[in-house]
Amino acid sequence: MTEGVTVQKVQSASSNGHKPNTVISQIISEMQSLLGSSFEVYTKTMTDFLIGQLSRKEMKSMLLTFAGKSNFDKLHNSIIFHILKLMQKNNDTFSALHHLPWFKRKKVDNSLFLHKKISSQNAQVRLIKRIVMSLSYKDRARIKTALKEKPVTPSLISGLLLETRIAKLPKIPVSRDKLNSVFVNDIKAGYVAPLACETLELPDSESLKERITAISLENGLLGGVQKGVSDIILAGLESHLKNILSRCFSILNKNIRQKNTENDAAGFTINDLNLAWTIEPHAFVEQYPQKLRMPFLLHDSYTEDEISICAESPSYMLASNDAQSDRNSVASLLDEVLS
């Protein structure tokens, strides 16, 4: 393809007084007589390549079909050189392409890539813009606000004041991508479980387990609750109630004895329970264990508030060496009985 006519021959042709359009027309007529009926395929291939619809590789594959004909390379190179010369002279791609004889376009198109439909749409847009700009500032602002897109998800108004404890979605302190719907259902089941103040009785093992599971999930413990946890809590609750009643009996021991002397059938009534809680309202509070109570008995009342637990007995409480073994045996026996 690179062999053939040189640039000097093209320049000599233009220096003889011939116009560039006349020279390129003669070359194209020679190419048409050479190719015959295949000239239309050649013109379509070159036009598509010049406007960017064909790549260089595709163009070369199409032109290889005409390479066997004599003088084809010379005429093809002459056409390319004249096109480049016109482009450099006019410095306008579109005007150079319009000099090609086979390049026919409609007069309504102002440029190479401008279609009639696009030009009509641009004219309609310019007309609408002229009408809008002729309006007042307030009207233009109203049109601008009307054309704004609305948010996809409207903002939710918090209804915390209207929600109940059961209706609210429970909050679990874990990331949302790890949230399981089973956890939410377990927490709701714990909320629905009846309270002891509502049933006026000790909770059963199943309802207590549901409440323990809900509280553990709210605090981030997602591993579940073991089977015997609710039974141990019920046993501790019964022991605590037993200690409260024992405390009430010790308070009203004298009153109960007087009733027994007057009436052999006398027992523990609601009035006695009310009297015991009136005398000592802190009877519901669990007492200190035996080991924590001992240091308070071993110190005087004028000591400081912050008292450390004595690991060993004070020196003034120690007996003589002769009776030390007997006292230690008695102390160990008392510890076993009190525990």
From Swiss-Prot:
InterPro entries documented for this protein: Hfi1/Tada1
CDD domains named in the record: HFD_HFI1 (cd22933)
Gene designation per UniProt: hfi1
Annotated function: Component of the transcription coactivator SAGA complex. SAGA acts as a general cofactor required for essentially all RNA polymerase II transcription. At the promoters, SAGA is required for transcription pre-initiation complex (PIC) recruitment. It influences RNA polymerase II transcriptional activity through different activities such as TBP interaction (via core/TAF module) and promoter selectivity, interaction with transcription activators (via Tra1/SPT module), and chromatin modification through histone acetylation (via HAT module) and deubiquitination (via DUB module).
GO molecular function, one term: transcription coactivator activity
Subunit structure: Component of the 1.8 MDa SAGA (Spt-Ada-Gcn5 acetyltransferase) complex, which is composed of 19 subunits tra1, spt7, taf5, ngg1/ada3, sgf73, spt20, spt8, taf12, taf6, hfi1/ada1, ubp8, gcn5, ada2, spt3, sgf29, taf10, taf9, sgf11 and sus1.
Cellular compartments annotated: Nucleus
Keywords, alphabetical: Nucleus, Transcription, Transcription regulation
Any single GO BP term: transcription initiation-coupled chromatin remodeling
Assigned protein family: Belongs to the HFI1 family.
Protein name, entry field: SAGA complex subunit Hfi1
Pfam families associated with the record: SAGA-Tad1
Gene Ontology CC, one term: SAGA complex
